[in-house]
């Protein structure tokens, strides 16, 4: 079976243009990958229109807003569907995406190649977002700098570390907020953190919803094994920052040794 490859290019507004060999009467299908054991529910169909040199193009506009998750890309011929392999991907516009201020809600799309070699689109949809800029580990402390999108920090902002699977165990830190109320830094140097995984949030003002710290605004769909940080040793524990499978920033706390 000859495998069809789809090229794709993104523009600054978040539009994705897919290009495939001429496909008369066919369409492009994006399928939100269901959680294990659940049926698929969300499909999005795009028309393919003739382009130059025997090619066909489909455009995924900035609207509609796609649900957060992983969208597999198929060629649809009647009711038959075939997963597409990746052709050339032009994602240059995403590389410095963190430099542009975003508005709420934040809708992010990153085309990528799956582990088994097919084309997919990773999407995030967040009411507001705290984009991690730097993570510095020095000695027994780690310092995180980040920037808010879709929210600002007037006064009384706090960073919260929340123990996953803990009984509501939370540590609160005071961030250093930059001019303009968007950029902030904070340092974790706590020898008394419980062993386990701590998720990181910022609350921009008292009573405001908590915003997850993550790194979403570039061309890396799966950051976990690409950005690997050392641990900070404090007292009898090692605190290591890492990116989750959703590109959220968390802390892993282990005993030393």
Predicted features along the sequence, with ranges:
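Basic, ligand-binding patches in group-transfer machinery
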Residues: 1-257
């Amino acid at each position: 079976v000859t495998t069809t490859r789809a090229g794709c290019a993104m523009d600054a507004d978040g539009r994705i243009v897919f290009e495939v060999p001429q496909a008369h009467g066919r369409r492009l299908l994006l399928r939100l990958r269901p959680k294990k054991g659940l049926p698929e529910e969300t499909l999005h169909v795009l028309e393919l229109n003739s382009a130059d040199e025997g090619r066909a193009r489909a455009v995924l506009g900035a609207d509609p807003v796609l649900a957060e998750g992983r969208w597999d890309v198929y060629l649809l011929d009647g009711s038959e569907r075939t997963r597409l392999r990746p052709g050339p991907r032009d994602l240059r516009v995403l590389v410095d995406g963190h430099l542009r201020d975003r508005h709420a809600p934040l809708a992010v799309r990153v085309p990528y190649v799956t582990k088994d070699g097919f084309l997919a689109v990773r999407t995030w949809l967040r009411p507001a977002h705290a984009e991690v800029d730097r993570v510095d580990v020095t000695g027994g402390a780690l310092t995180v700098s980040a920037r808010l999108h879709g929210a600002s920090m007037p006064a009384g902002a706090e960073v919260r570390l929340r123990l996953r699977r803990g009984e509501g165990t939370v540590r609160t830190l005071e961030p250093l907020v930059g001019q303009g109320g968007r950029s902030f830094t904070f340092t974790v140097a706590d020898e008394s953190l419980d062993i386990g995984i701590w998720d990181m949030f910022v609350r921009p003002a008292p009573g405001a919803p908590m915003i997850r710290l993550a790194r979403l605004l570039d061309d890396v769909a799966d950051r976990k094994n690409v950005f690997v940080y050392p641990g900070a040793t404090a007292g009898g524990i090692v605190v290591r920052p890492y990116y989750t499978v959703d590109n959220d920033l968390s802390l892993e706390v282990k005993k030393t040794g």
